[in-house]
Amino acid sequence: MGLPWYRVHTVVLNDPGRLISVHLMHTALVAGWAGSMALYELAIYDPSDPVLNPMWRQGMFVLPFMARLGVTQSWGGWSVTGGTATDPGFWSFEGVAAAHIVLSGLLFLAAVWHWVYWDLELFRDPRTGEPALDLPKMFGIHLFLSGLLCFGFGAFHLTGLFGPGMWISDPYGVTGSVQPVAPEWGPDGFNPFNPGGVVAHHIAAGIVGIIAGLFHLTVRPPERLYKALRMGNIETVLSSSIAAVFFAAFVVAGTMWYGNATTPIELFGPTRYQWDQGYFHQEIERRVQSSVAQGASLSEAWSQIPEKLAFYDYVGNSPAKGGLFRTGPMVKGDGIAQSWQGHGVFKDAEGRELTVRRLPNFFETFPVILTDADGVVRADIPFRRAESKYSFEQSGVTVSFYGGDLDGKTFTDPADVKKYARKAQGGEIFEFDRETLNSDGVFRTSPRGWFTFGHAVFALLFFFGHLWHGARTIYRDVFAGVEADLEEQVEWGLFQKVGDKSTRVRKEA
């Protein structure tokens, strides 16, 4: 046919059988990729330390999505939560991967069948014998089925009625597990951090979809609306489908980057705003102050802080710290976290407690500045020692540790104090192993960053695709020079002007 690469889909424009075939093949590729990727991630995933070396630090992409829907155990005997797997059954990580690969194979066979048997009676109008699709009816069928699926997911899977529920955690991502969730029908269901709203909205949206599907199956569209929206044109279906997909992509990019109700921080890592706002730092300080108020010493108070919570309060776990073109998981950057060193409290020679100013998300290097309770700069690491006024040597800065490996230790040597001050810029101080994976010390983003970037970019591309195909279907008569509802068959070369019966070509004698 000699079609250029960007026009090859023309071959399925008026061929419903092969249009089904290529969609089946596409779904086969998606399911096959998902299953294969899951097996690859399972092969490289180290489940030994879910606290300091969780799946999101290791760059796992599909495993967190399985875990949030209730798949948390492996046939290998381990669990996402760190315990031993107890009777994972078929729906383990490996079972889900295998199911996707088997599904991929079946879809491939279905695609081949529909490619070979493309000219089915189903696609022909019994009155005329011409190829015809009842697109409004098909729309109703698809809407009904998707509504049924949406309702079933909310009413059965998420509620635990027939399914595991979903991943639920506390606001600080410390005690997460898979639990059944009751729907929240009140105003709190609109709280973006309330998982009960997710359940209620799936049930409600499913019911609306079922009703809408039945409506479109029983009520025919008015003729004017049918023509205005080009409901008889398959490219209208393409355009509106692309619109649905790009809208969904924009939504999930937003929920991934900003929220954590459906993307728990235990599975996908913290959001950048939790670092920006000192979210975990404030909670840690609140817990410490509460313990001290109850009579605990600073050492005891800091020792009660979960290592998991302290690890969230570390800049290297912010998804905004990694450049988009730095490939690899987080552990290939700063390394594999080994242990929490403890919370460093800095003081100057006059006994004032100093706070190290924390590194903002978009800085790779940042001056080491220590301020007192009033925000006055009392110490820094100068760029030029000749002009320094607040150097650690001049200010007599020391650091004492509470909790962690260095609990109870105090360092007075300026070289040691500077080392810990630089580390304190990044939040809580941890010891990292950079040798095992040959980590280069340059921060990487978490799967949260990759997912957001990918979906935002593709949403934008699909938005333009929607405009393109929408314009093609609405202005089809303008582009082709043929009216959309022209009844008489146009014979090319019969008329001097296409479709104008008064301008017949004169045949040469």
Curated annotation (Swiss-Prot):
Chief subcellular location: membrane
Q: Which residues cross the membrane?
A: 21-36, 101-115, 140-156, 203-218, 237-252, 457-472
**What is its subcellular localisation?**
Cellular thylakoid membrane
Gene Ontology molecular functions: chlorophyll binding; electron transporter, transferring electrons within the cyclic electron transport pathway of photosynthesis activity
Cellular component per GO, a single term: photosystem II
Family per UniProt? Belongs to the PsbB/PsbC family. PsbB subfamily.
Q: What is this protein called?
A: Photosystem II CP47 reaction center protein
Q: Which organism is it from?
A: Nostoc sp. (strain PCC 7120 / SAG 25.82 / UTEX 2576)
